């Protein structure tokens, strides 16, 4: 397994543990479709959260917040729409969030990354 993949998994593990500590329940992890991948799908109360996890060792290259490009955001939105269609989830409150992890700092939960 490549180092970046291992670090990515460790970042997802940390993000999941953080979200669970905030009361979230895991529905799916690394969910794939033709449009892309959703790192974590969790339920928080009555809301489904689609979570992009970003991990960086340090602030080099602008930090983790700069790693979610407009094209990545579009892929995520399309993946969310597809997930909702495939699971026949209509009129279910949902949101696209991000958990950013930078080095040894605590995770940062960005809610509603689509604005």
Swiss-Prot record:
Xref: Pfam families: UPF0102
| UniProt superkingdom | Bacteria
InterPro entries, alphabetized = Restrct_endonuc-II-like (IPR011335), tRNA_endonuc-like_dom_sf (IPR011856), UPF0102_YraN-like (IPR003509)
Record's HAMAP family?
A: UPF0102
The record's PANTHER family line, in alphabetical order, gives: UPF0102 PROTEIN YRAN (PTHR34039:SF1)
Q: Which family does it belong to?
A: Belongs to the UPF0102 family.
Q: What is this protein called?
A: UPF0102 protein NMB2089
Name the species this protein comes from: Neisseria meningitidis serogroup B (strain ATCC BAA-335 / MC58)
Instruction: Specify the taxonomic lineage.
Output: Bacteria, Pseudomonadati, Pseudomonadota, Betaproteobacteria, Neisseriales
């Amino acid at each position: 397994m490549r180092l970046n993949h291992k670090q990515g998994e460790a970042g997802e593990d940390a993000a999941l543990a953080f979200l669970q500590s905030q009361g979230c329940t895991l529905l799916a992890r690394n969910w794939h479709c033709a449009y892309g991948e959703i790192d974590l799908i969790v339920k928080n109360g009555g809301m489904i959260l689609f979570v992009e996890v970003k991990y960086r060792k340090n602030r080099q290259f602008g930090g983790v917040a700069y790693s979610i490009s407009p094209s990545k955001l579009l892929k995520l939105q399309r993946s969310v729409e597809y997930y909702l269609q495939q699971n026949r989830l209509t009129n279910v409150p949902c949101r696209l969030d991000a958990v950013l992890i930078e080095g040894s700092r605590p995770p940062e939960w960005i809610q509603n990354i689509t604005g």
